[in-house]
Amino acid sequence: MLHLHILSWVLAIILFIATYLNISKNQGGTPYFKPLHMVLRLFMLLMLISGFWILIQSFMNGGANHMLLTLKMLCGVAVVGLMEVSIAKRKRHEQSHTMFWITIALIIITMVLGVILPLGPLSKLFGIG
């Protein structure tokens, strides 16, 4: 399930940037905008379901840091919301650059939290998790 979660995160980030850039300020969305946005929503759904499943498994194992897991879950849900809001603002021709960069910053924070959690690569490298 962890590999599905990581794959959905990577593809969602790529699709988010592609969807965001496929909206012209003057003409609106390109012909590729709608399919990209729908596929992005699919991967966001996969990301949320797999993340929730990993959260439940980690809570049941008992050896995880519950506070960091909950913080990563909240950051992940916030990233999904910010992705949708920044795309919607860009589609309505409103100022969306700030929202885009806030989303990118929160994506980086969420990825750092994922790396240092017990199932992350740093924990496995040093034998912590």
Swiss-Prot record:
Membrane topology according to the record: Multi-pass membrane protein
Taxonomy, superkingdom: Bacteria
Membrane-crossing segments per the record: 1-21, 36-56, 67-87, 99-119
Entry keyword Cell membrane: yes
Pfam families: DUF1516
Location in or out of the cell: Cell membrane
Chief location of this protein within or outside the cell: membrane
Keyword annotations: Cell membrane, Membrane, Transmembrane, Transmembrane helix
Gene Ontology CC entries for this record: plasma membrane
Family recorded in the similarity comment: Belongs to the UPF0344 family.
NCBIfam families (UniProt xref): PRK13673.1-2, PRK13673.1-6
HAMAP family for this protein: UPF0344
Protein name per Swiss-Prot or TrEMBL: UPF0344 protein SAB0838
Species name: Staphylococcus aureus (strain bovine RF122 / ET3-1)
